[in-house]
Amino acid sequence: MNAPQKHSAPITVEVALGDRAYEIVIGRDVIASLGERIAKLRPGARTAIVTDRTVAKTWLKRTEEVLDQAGIAHASVIVGEGESSKSYAGLEQVCEALIAAKIERNDLVIALGGGVIGDLAGFSASLLRRGVDFVQVPTSLLAQVDSSVGGKTGINSPQGKNLIGTFHQPVLVLADTAILDTLSPRQFRAGYAEVAKYGALGDEAFFAWLEANHAELFSGGAAREHAVATSCRAKAAIVARDERETGDRALLNLGHTFGHALEAATGFSDRLFHGEGVAIGMVLAAEFSAERGMMPATDAERLAKHLAEVGLPTRLQDIAGFTQEGLADADRLMALMAQDKKVKRGELTFILMEGIGRAVIASKVEPAPVRDFLQRKLAQA
């Protein structure tokens, strides 16, 4: 893989979806162009900024300033932080606030935040007046490389993650890499799991580049922009081929079947961030694949080694409160995986691996070997 160049101008990645195509604009301080871009996209539109309390303290004023400079009217909706806001109550709060702000069909909702805000604001926009367009301004690494791109929106159910939702594409994504400087180390690491996922599922050269360059990526600079852009290009290409996840878009769920079950078992709490669940889930998927003879055990070890090297959890035992009831229970985890979105007619579908850079969709996976695998992993505590 070629070394990244220093970018004096933003990088633009197109999501090619015909008359619903949109741009992902990546670079430092691209948020400064938000007002100008909205004015061109939707002249005369009013906006409502949906964000959470933490992001509001740092980025709401800046966002309002760039909208003011472009003469764009704006309201704001502030919700609590974390997965608890991705709920029926959170959806009601946002929808009612948008209605109170008199947001109409020709106006825009702005999702200013991480993956939770993007999912919640996008879902609310998709429902409001049967569909209002929205703009993604992702403020976490995870959101910039994954959840802000592709149009998946939704909330969680007590029975599982992202079970209530819609496909609703944004009209613009602004990925300001300067915003990532304000993330905690743990938040940044969690987002990095999704970056590594793109290499693990379909680009061994990118994975090797990450192994060699992750230190520079974590410290900022051109490597960070290169990683975000490479990740977005990978996702944009898959979304353009399979917008509604009827085929190979499911590959993007590498690590998510195990990971979502672990998130649900931990109550969608700060005990396990989404990216951390994905990291553990990818390692479990790789190890399960190796046990089935699908990939070399050395590749599974390589994946686990790299994720651990950057500080991500890679084992069930790395989760806080691991021994609490509901987590160290193979049957409970199997029941949660049975609610996975990829389940068809009650049969499990996993994203497994044939090697680094070669993920595959495995349909009709028998539950007994999965349960046995989990029981053995749990017994290693």
UniProtKB/Swiss-Prot annotation:
Its cofactor is Co(2+); Zn(2+); NAD(+). Keywords: Amino-acid biosynthesis, Aromatic amino acid biosynthesis, Cobalt, Cytoplasm, Lyase, Metal-binding, NAD, Nucleotide-binding, Zinc. Transmembrane segments: none annotated. It is found in: Cytoplasm. Pfam families: DHQ_synthase (PF01761), DHQS_C (PF24621). Binds 1 divalent metal cation per subunit. Can use either Co(2+) or Zn(2+). One of its GO terms (biological process) is amino acid biosynthetic process. One of its GO terms (molecular function) is 3-dehydroquinate synthase activity. NAD(+) binds at residues 81-86, 115-119, 139-140, 152, 161. It catalyses: 7-phospho-2-dehydro-3-deoxy-D-arabino-heptonate = 3-dehydroquinate + phosphate. Its EC number is 4.2.3.4. Belongs to the sugar phosphate cyclases superfamily. Dehydroquinate synthase family. Catalyzes the conversion of 3-deoxy-D-arabino-heptulosonate 7-phosphate (DAHP) to dehydroquinate (DHQ). This is 3-dehydroquinate synthase. It comes from Rhodopseudomonas palustris (strain ATCC BAA-98 / CGA009).
